[in-house]
């Protein structure tokens, strides 16, 4: 009986969603499809994006799609065991739940995310909200000072970490990772705090320092 009930509920939800898609224009339906695709790929969508070179901020059209069709997208995601969460403080939409693909970070990528969290915190405390940019030279310096990075990283290690952070909307790069130089600006979004957020930064640093000495 419960299986039949579940099937009927799912069928009704699907019919409702198909009806909804028929009420929007073809272009808007495509926007909804791409936005859902981005949510799964990135896990979050920012309200505002930033150009790291000019610090010019611009509205993200995908965020506006989430706002306009929030109920529909939430219903669609719920069928896939996911939940659409709006975080007004961080100005993001993100997805959580069993249906979300979790990406395992390598130890080095995790360390680099922690370093970015530290740099972001220090910039916010010291220079205000408009100066959350960093660069490879500064990340290396923080790595050396915290003892989280004790050797020269390979190009592949940098690439893996930066691509993952860009994909998940933690940073913005002015171009391809391969073209980054030591002082090319990298913009850090506040979403860097959404990741590894369960512990205090200092606690995280201690944990990963211990991992290196064992």
Model region roles, listed by residue range:
Residues 187-214:
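Short, amphipathic alpha-helical interaction segments positioned at domain boundaries
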Residues 3-96:
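Eukaryotic partner-binding/assembly regions in large regulatory complexes
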Residues 50-58, 126-145:
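Short acidic, hydrophobic short linear motifs in intrinsically disordered regions
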Residues 55-66, 102, 140-153:
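Short helix-coil junctions and helix-kink-helix linkers
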Residues 80-86, 162, 166-178:
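A short, conserved structural fragment
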Residues 65-73, 150-167:
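Short amphipathic alpha-helical interaction segments
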Residues 91-95, 178-189:
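Minor-groove-contacting beta-hairpin "wing" of winged helix-turn-helix DNA-binding domains
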Residues 30, 97-133:
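Short alpha-helical segments that sit at the start of domains
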């Amino acid at each position: 009986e419960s299986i039949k009930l579940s099937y009927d509920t799912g069928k009704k939800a699907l019919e409702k969603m198909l009806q909804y898609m028929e009420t929007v224009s073809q272009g808007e339906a495509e926007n909804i499809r791409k936005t859902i695709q981005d949510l799964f790929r990135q896990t979050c969508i920012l309200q505002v994006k930033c150009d790291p070179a000019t610090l010019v901020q611009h509205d993200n059209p995908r965020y506006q799609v989430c706002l306009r069709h929030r109920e529909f997208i939430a219903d669609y995601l719920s069928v896939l065991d996911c939940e659409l969460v709006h975080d007004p403080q961080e100005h993001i939409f993100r997805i959580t739940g069993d249906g979300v693909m979790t990406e395992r970070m390598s130890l080095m990528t995790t360390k680099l995310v922690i370093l970015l969290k530290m740099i972001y915190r220090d910039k916010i405390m010291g220079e205000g909200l408009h100066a959350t940019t960093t660069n490879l030279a500064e990340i290396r310096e923080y790595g050396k000072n915290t003892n989280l990075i004790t050797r020269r990283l390979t190009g592949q290690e940098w690439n893996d970490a930066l691509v993952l952070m860009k994909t998940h909307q933690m940073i913005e790069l002015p171009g391809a990772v391969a073209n980054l130089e030591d002082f090319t600006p990298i913009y850090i979004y506040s979403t860097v705090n959404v990741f590894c957020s369960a512990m205090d930064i200092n606690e995280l640093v201690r944990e990963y320092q211990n991992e290196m000495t064992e």
